[in-house]
UniProtKB/Swiss-Prot annotation:
Residues 1-64 are annotated as: Domain I. The RuvA-RuvB-RuvC complex processes Holliday junction (HJ) DNA during genetic recombination and DNA repair, while the RuvA-RuvB complex plays an important role in the rescue of blocked DNA replication forks via replication fork reversal (RFR). RuvA specifically binds to HJ cruciform DNA, conferring on it an open structure. The RuvB hexamer acts as an ATP-dependent pump, pulling dsDNA into and through the RuvAB complex. HJ branch migration allows RuvC to scan DNA until it finds its consensus sequence, where it cleaves and resolves the cruciform DNA. The gene is ruvA. Keywords: Cytoplasm, DNA damage, DNA recombination, DNA repair, DNA-binding. NCBIfam families: ruvA (TIGR00084). It is found in: Cytoplasm. This is Holliday junction branch migration complex subunit RuvA. Residues 138-184 are annotated as: Domain III. It comes from Campylobacter concisus (strain 13826).
Amino acid sequence: MIKAIEGVVTKKEPAFAVLKTNSGVSYGIFISLFCSAKLSKGEKVELAITQIIREDANLLYGFLDANEQKMFEMLIKLNGIGASTAMAVCSSLSSQAFTNAIISGDADTFKSVPGIGPKTARRIIAELSDTKLISDESVPSYQNEALLALEALGFKREKIVKILPDCKSENTSDLIKEALKKLG
């Protein structure tokens, strides 16, 4: 099983790249639009790989971001979601937007992705709402602590997730106070 490939980008399209390794082997890898925007032809990169082996193909999906890879892998495990639909989600939503949409039950966010209709959007939310979602390491721990404290006070997670990004405080107690004012 291939877990990562390091090489030079020899070809780049919006959703596909070719990496040539030091050994001279070139790999065709499907990538998201976010990943494509960060790659440059001639650049040496390492992509984390999710390999999908089918009867008729051996497909490689590459990621610069671990959260994007986790999001992709969560989606392809769902019934009726294939790799191309999962990659469309990765190309349309950041990992934070993905997590927020599931937590808040926002089907419209998923319906905005090409190839996802209302039933599929609801199914994604229903099937992933109980799973441990992506933890964004860029989210400071004080925000997570504030989220847990506000939930303990009885506020709904969906409402908390919507207002926390607007709060400017940078420590747990001040963030809780600011959030309480916004939550009413």
